[in-house]
Amino acid sequence: MPATARWTARKIGLDGFTPGQINELDTNILIGASYLKLALDEFRGSMPLAAAAYNAGPNRPRAWRNGPTLEAAIWAETIPYGETRDYVKKVLSNTTDYAALLSGRPQSLKSRLGSVGPAPVDEPVLTKDLP
């Protein structure tokens, strides 16, 4: 998404960014990883919400989290968009698998991902302009 790439480049201080640079491997990885970090910050480290925001934009998971508090793996099944639901499940599964490989210890999906529920009313939005 060119607009998201431009926004992220500005946010991280990548001076002189042009949309064509998104095709450069190093720039693409930098912008993608930076956007994911901004989404993680926005959603207070919630990997399921950040993955959903990365795929569907941040406004959708902001709305989707307003139901009952659920285990993240169960919450992912409630995502109304099939593409985003599948994306989030794959990201969460792969994150857990790679964490196990890197640590040499089995990982619990439930303990790594926590739960998803409504944001606390006093929780400020960090990057309200996150596209």
What kind of feature is each model-predicted range?
Residues 37-44:
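Hydrophobic alpha-helical bundle architecture
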Residues 2-3, 7, 21-22, 46, ...:
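Helical anchoring/docking segments at protein termini
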Residues 11-27, 41, 76-82:
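Short, contiguous acidic/charged loop-to-helix segments that flank catalytic cores in large enzymes
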Residues 2, 24, 63, 77, ...:
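Generic structural "secondary-structure junction" signal
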Residues 33, 68, 119-120:
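Short alpha-helix boundary/capping motifs
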Residues 45-104:
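Catalytic and substrate-binding regions of cell-wall glycan-acting enzymes that process beta-1,4-linked
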